Amino acid sequence: MYQLAGRHKKRVHKSVVVAVTALVVGSIGCVATYRFWPTELPKPVVVAKPQARAYAVSAQSNTLFVGDVYTGRSVNVWAQASPLKYAYPFSRLSEFNRGSYNAWIANLECPTVAGLHLTPVQEEATLSFNCDPGYLPELAKWFNVVTLANNHTDNQGVAGFAETQQHLTENGIQYFGHPDPRQVNDLCDVIALPASVRMSDGKTVDGDLPVAMCGYHGFIRLPSPEAIAVMNEYSAYMPVIAMPHAGTEYKAAPDALKTNLYRSMIDNGADMVLGGHPHWVQTTESYKGHLIVYSMGNFIFDQQGSLEVTRSAAINVQFNVQGADAALLAKWLALGKTCGTYHDNCLVQAKAAKLAKLPFAFKFGVVGADDSNRITRPASPAVQAGILQRMNWTETMSQLQAPYFSL
């Protein structure tokens, strides 16, 4: 019995040892598992799909066309007597809310030859103008494009005209037109018109729309039918804006000769005609549903004798492209990047690529200006009302036809 009991005790002891050992090993395993096994299952790897590249869905250029701009003669005297110097003629243009526009376009009414300083008496006696190139950096802060098709840009001869073009290029100002309408190859140019481009992701980016602008000087001699017909080549592909400089000065309405000339521009492909030269605001009309402005008047000038010569009508034109094929719009915007230099080959490129014309719509408004007391600024309500009345604006707007509309 004693021996049996002893063996039994040994077996119990061994069982206890085995159980304790198993418990310890199990505990160590649990600790190891707790320490080395992740507390959470690994998250599945998600491969991000490449985002679709945003593309242009629409484009708009809010542009202001103004009348005659001249910084010579008395304007120069006033400016140089002012602490603002070359900035003086432009010192209140901020009141027009320049930031709300993509572009400003003007008629530059003088050559810019360096070192040629004429007094007001000299300029008045000969009506041969020159403007100091020192004004161009200030002009460039406001204006993107100018027309050179008028009766003064050639006042300093062929060399003076070429120098003017050079100074404009140096200051980043695009230009078009020629003082001699017989220079048929120099009348129209494709301009890179700054625009706001709406993208498919909702963002808005800057872009350029190719637009043809044609300048016609018709004061000395009328442009020939051949010169007017040049616009047809451009109008098959893009919008065409005609900016003629013609007619009798200091009149409230055009004569029959001028009326027929400007209407012929519409007949030959112009979307609109925005005229200058008479120094007064003149009437407007809707011709075949298109807008003709016979004269916008003086925007920056030294004439101060009456309200007629100090008020002017700036024409706000909205160029809208909506509903265009995305691929077609992308091609035109890509082309626009190459249209910022004089006599570029943008029309040739458009023809070679067989680009279809974009579906443009145009909206028009009038922004009155007043340069009495020597500084150009927005017109008062009374002056604005007089401008609209002279232009018979309400009637003209009511007679426009699609794609031309009132703002």
Residue ranges and their predicted role:
Residues P42-A149, T153-G157, T164:
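N-terminal catalytic scaffold of extracellular/periplasmic and nuclease hydrolases
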Residues A114-E138, M238-A270:
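Active-site-proximal segments of metal-dependent phosphoesterases and phosphodiesterases across multiple
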Residues K43-P44, A48, A54-Q60, A253, ...:
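A short C-terminal boundary segment appended to hydrolase-like catalytic domains
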Residues F65-G67, A103-E109, F143-N151, F176-P179, ...:
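Active-site neighborhood of phospho(di)ester-bond hydrolases with catalytic His/Asp-centered motifs
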Residues M1-S15:
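N-terminal Lys/Arg-rich, disordered targeting/topogenic segments
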Residues N76-S91, A125-T126, V190-M243, E249, ...:
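Binuclear metal-dependent hydrolase catalytic cores centered on His/Asp/Glu-rich metal-binding motifs
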Residues G72-S74, T112-G115, N151-Q165, R182-C188, ...:
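Active-site environment of divalent metal-dependent phosphoester hydrolases
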Residues W142-V145, A256-I315, V321-D325:
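Conserved beta-sheet core of the metallophosphoesterase superfamily
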